[in-house]
Amino acid sequence: MSFTVRCRIVVLSLSIVAALAMVDKSAHAGMEEAVKAMQANDLATAEKELQVLIKERDPRAQFLAGLYIYGNPESKMYDVNKATPMLLDAAERGYVPAMLPLAGAYAEGKGVPKSAYEAYKWILIAERWNAPVVPQSYEPLLRELKPDEIEKAKAAAVAYTFKTK
């Protein structure tokens, strides 16, 4: 390979690295601006800032939008049919902060069919990944479930593997 070709490859490689760094910075900037907007209770701006990240399935953005923008009953944008799928996608890919709100959505049937089994399973998965789970969050579910359903949920939680795509 000639010197000129090698130089072009190096320049192309550096250009790609620079472009990726810029994308990462813009994603970081979008997240930072969204958090600032949420702190100022400007959920419309927060939603706008998170949209690109949500489309890229960034679990942090899905969590913030799913819990604070669409999942907040005090928000003008409250829509559990938008919120819960975002929380589910983030949780299924291993984003632990999304797991307990998702369990709550299943327990209450908000944006998903009501299911004590699914709620308990997600609580167990979250607990397995060191989320702080208090007994009050799952005791009512245990009263709804039969002993075999409890054991099935425990087994499902232990066997659960996160999606990678």
Task: Locate predicted features.
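Structural signature of tandem alpha-helical TPR/SEL1-like repeats
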Residues: 39-48, 75-86, 113-121, 152
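Bacterial N-terminal signal peptides that target proteins for export
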Residues: 2-12
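Short helix-capping/linker turns of helical repeat alpha-solenoids
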Residues: 41, 55-59, 71-73, 92-96, ...
